[in-house]
From Swiss-Prot:
<comment type="function">
    <text>One of the early assembly proteins it binds 23S rRNA. One of the proteins that surrounds the polypeptide exit tunnel on the outside of the ribosome. Forms the main docking site for trigger factor binding to the ribosome.</text>
</comment>
<dbReference type="GO" id="GO:1990904">
    <property type="term" value="C:ribonucleoprotein complex"/>
</dbReference>
<dbReference type="InterPro" id="IPR012678">
    <property type="entry name" value="Ribosomal_uL23/eL15/eS24_sf"/>
</dbReference>
<protein>
    <recommendedName>
        <fullName>Large ribosomal subunit protein uL23</fullName>
    </recommendedName>
</protein>
<comment type="subunit">
    <text>Part of the 50S ribosomal subunit. Contacts protein L29, and trigger factor when it is bound to the ribosome.</text>
</comment>
<keyword id="KW-0699">rRNA-binding</keyword>
<dbReference type="GO" id="GO:0019843">
    <property type="term" value="F:rRNA binding"/>
</dbReference>
<comment type="similarity">
    <text>Belongs to the universal ribosomal protein uL23 family.</text>
</comment>
<dbReference type="Pfam" id="PF00276">
    <property type="entry name" value="Ribosomal_L23"/>
</dbReference>
<keyword id="KW-0694">RNA-binding</keyword>
<dbReference type="GO" id="GO:0006412">
    <property type="term" value="P:translation"/>
</dbReference>
<dbReference type="InterPro" id="IPR012677">
    <property type="entry name" value="Nucleotide-bd_a/b_plait_sf"/>
</dbReference>
<dbReference type="GO" id="GO:0005840">
    <property type="term" value="C:ribosome"/>
</dbReference>
<dbReference type="GO" id="GO:0003735">
    <property type="term" value="F:structural constituent of ribosome"/>
</dbReference>
<dbReference type="InterPro" id="IPR013025">
    <property type="entry name" value="Ribosomal_uL23-like"/>
</dbReference>
<keyword id="KW-0689">Ribosomal protein</keyword>
<keyword id="KW-0687">Ribonucleoprotein</keyword>
């Protein structure tokens, strides 16, 4: 897998209460991924990008909602999320957004 495909597969982390609880208790990291990405591609991308060992990958596809824009109906895009279980004792280093917001306010 080349570097370009890695960045196409992993779109970014999911920052939510559920994702944070899973990360703290079960060692699971949650990522938004490409809708066509396979579990094997996701596993290889996380291992290569973050240098951790992946135990398993679970995925979900959330269907986009139908929204009204004036008289016309539109539809939001479908989103695929990957729940990546890491080997015990390993963690993915991500930027803490809370610190940057506080330093920007000063």
């Amino acid at each position: 897998m080349n570097n370009e495909r890695i960045y196409q597969v992993l779109k970014g982390p999911v920052f939510s209460e559920k994702a944070q609880v899973l990360g703290d208790t079960a060692g699971v990291q949650v990522f938004k991924v490409d809708i066509n990405a396979t579990k094997l591609e996701i596993k290889k991308a996380v291992e290569k990008l973050f240098g951790v060992e992946v135990v398993k990958v679970n995925t979900t596809i959330t269907k986009g909602k139908t929204k009204r824009f004036g008289r016309t109906l539109g539809r939001r895009s479908d989103v695929k999320k990957a729940y990546v279980t890491l080997k015990a004792g390993q963690d993915v280093e991500m930027a803490d957004l809370g610190d940057t917001a506080e330093s920007a306010a000063e």
